[in-house]
């Protein structure tokens, strides 16, 4: 079984929340990027952040 690719934390410098345009934090355990201001968590799949509101989990 192969592991899925790791998220490149350097992406955090370039990515912002599509709703609030605020910064994001990385939750390694859940593999999500979290926008505390918008109260949304965006999934990371195969090392790629899915920055669609329709895919986000409400906090």
Curated annotation (Swiss-Prot):
Pfam families registered for this protein in UniProt: Trm112p (PF03966)
SUPFAM superfamilies the UniProt entry points to: Trm112p-like
GO CC entries: cytosol
InterPro entries: Trm112-like
Family: Belongs to the UPF0434 family.
Name this protein carries in UniProt: UPF0434 protein Rsph17025_2896
Species name: Cereibacter sphaeroides (strain ATCC 17025 / ATH 2.4.3)
Taxonomic path: Bacteria, Pseudomonadati, Pseudomonadota, Alphaproteobacteria, Rhodobacterales
């Amino acid at each position: 079984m192969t592991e899925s690719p790791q998220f490149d934390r350097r992406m955090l410098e370039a990515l912002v929340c599509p709703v609030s345009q605020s910064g994001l934090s990385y939750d390694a355990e859940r593999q999500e990027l979290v926008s505390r201001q918008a109260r949304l968590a965006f999934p990371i799949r195969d090392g790629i952040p899915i920055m669609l509101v329709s895919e986000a989990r409400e906090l």
